[in-house]
């Protein structure tokens, strides 16, 4: 079903409160490209890249942003339908690949060398490349320049800094303690890890959740709470509000938080996360990726579009102008974007971080580590007990 772009946008807004029926989406068919990307990304910019592709090749490109596309894709792709190209965070792609829904991609070495090597690791599943890395997200330390012109380089400096700021009615640091995505950089700094990654594969029995490094990181976090430098019940909205009102000097968050801080008029900077025991904090790294549907009859066209139109300075610039991508996988365009110190810091933290594993076992990891951190932070369990239980849950 072909719908003109303007009409489609109207149709989409009318359907926001309804489930997007499969019939409302363009069908997979030879000789045209259908792309799905989430509604919070620069889909209008991506459509501009599609127009250039159509002008050069005569191949029509339709960009759609269906609701819950990450759940819809496996349903429709399993029946041989859906988009030719799907954009989503890389960690869902392992499950798709396991179900046989993604085509293996074969970019040549010259093309692979245009992108940062660690981004290719994010889209490798059982040793095979299953998507193209596009953009990179990681947590950074965000600080209020008026309260704290020089942010601390180490976690160990934070207790003394908090005492100084408390004397002025402020606090040093508030961030989301309820979700392990935010607490993991500290837990992983001295040697914690989710699943061991070797030779392009994850060993699901080699889990680093209760090793000495993970225990040291979580113990430090618990001590910050015990010593009243942080509150165990701090969640995302509490931490965001405190930082954006100028009540706390620092928070830990990602590029998605910048627009709200801009609106709040806080004079802020984004920098590298503090070290712990001399080791860099290791945030989980998410990579916005583009996979090709195994059922697509247009795999070569999809490859041409992604390699020679989207993953170019001009292509990524069109998407970025619509909605900021953050840091990007393409070295040449990242060098341009990194003139913004916020983006340079995001990439630096990502390069020091841990690629979020793209395996189904991560759901057990999130559940177990969330419980462990909350129990240790509240004093319901010791750090050793909490992490031992988490390790057992993940590996059982």
UniProtKB/Swiss-Prot annotation:
Role according to the record: Part of the ABC transporter complex MalEFGK involved in maltose/maltodextrin import. Binds maltose and higher maltodextrins such as maltotriose.
Keyword hit for Kinase: no
Induction: Induced by maltose and the transcriptional regulator MalT. Permanently repressed by cold shock in a PNPase-dependent fashion.
Name of the gene this protein is made from: malE
InterPro entries, sorted: Maltose/Cyclodextrin-bd, SBP, SBP_1_CS
Record lineage: Bacteria, Pseudomonadati, Pseudomonadota, Gammaproteobacteria, Enterobacterales
GO molecular function: carbohydrate transmembrane transporter activity; maltose binding
Family under the similarity heading: Belongs to the bacterial solute-binding protein 1 family.
Organism for this UniProt entry: Escherichia coli (strain K12)
Subunit structure: The complex is composed of two ATP-binding proteins (MalK), two transmembrane proteins (MalG and MalF) and a solute-binding protein (MalE).
One Gene Ontology CC term in the entry: maltose transport complex
Presence of keyword Signal: yes
GO terms classed as biological process: carbohydrate transport; cell chemotaxis; detection of maltose stimulus; DNA damage response; maltodextrin transmembrane transport; maltose transport
Protein name in the entry: Maltose/maltodextrin-binding periplasmic protein
Location in the cell: Periplasm
Keyword set, alphabetical order: Periplasm, Signal, Sugar transport, Transport
Residues making up the signal peptide according to the UniProt record: 1-26
Domain of life: Bacteria
